């Protein structure tokens, strides 16, 4: 007997699951694993950007500035900002008609 043919059987009123009242440990374990898998899949799809960004970059927030004079901190911030500033000369402007 295959589990696939025994799970759902038609009755007069509606479809019923024969395993719903079963106390078989294998059925209980597979049900729990199935529910956990579904919950984890839903959470993964909802929060995949946050989760994978955390895995990729960790909790790093940049280098520590403890013990560094304020003038050097400001210089570092300006260097970082200038590194991210966009130079328009590197891009081609395309106008759509």
From Swiss-Prot:
The record marks 41 as: Seems to be involved in pH gating. Residues 60-83 are annotated as: Disordered. Residues 1-22 are virion surface. It is found in: Virion membrane; Host apical cell membrane. The modification Phosphoserine is found at residues 64, 82. GO terms for cellular component: host cell plasma membrane; membrane; virion membrane. It is a single-pass type III membrane protein. The record marks 37 as: Essential for channel activity, possibly by being protonated during channel activation, and by forming the channel gate and the selective filter. It holds the Pfam family Flu_M2. The keyword Glycosyltransferase does not apply. Residues 44-97 are intravirion. The M2 protein from most influenza A strains is inhibited by amantadine and rimantadine, resulting in viral uncoating incapacity. Emergence of amantadine-resistant variants is usually rapid. Keywords: Disulfide bond, Host cell membrane, Host membrane, Host-virus interaction, Hydrogen ion transport, Inhibition of host autophagy by virus, Ion channel, Ion transport, Lipoprotein, Membrane, Palmitate, Phosphoprotein, Signal-anchor, Transmembrane, Transmembrane helix, Transport, Viral ion channel, Virion. A lipid is attached at residue 50 (S-palmitoyl cysteine). HAMAP family: INFV_M2. Cytoplasmic tail plays an important role in virion assembly and morphogenesis. When the channel is activated, one or more imidazole moieties of His-37 probably become bi-protonated. This is Matrix protein 2. It comes from Influenza A virus (strain A/Chicken/Hong Kong/715.5/2001 H5N1 genotype E). The gene is M.
């Amino acid at each position: 007997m295959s589990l696939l043919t025994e799970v759902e059987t038609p009755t007069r009123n509606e479809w019923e699951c024969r395993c719903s009242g079963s106390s078989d440990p294998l059925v209980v374990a597979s049900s729990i694993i199935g529910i956990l898998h579904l919950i984890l899949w839903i959470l993964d799809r909802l929060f995949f950007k946050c989760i994978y960004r955390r895995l990729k970059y960790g909790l790093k927030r940049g280098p520590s500035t403890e013990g560094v004079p304020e003038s050097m901190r400001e210089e570092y911030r300006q260097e970082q900002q200038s590194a991210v500033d966009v130079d328009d000369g590197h891009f081609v402007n395309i106008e759509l008609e």
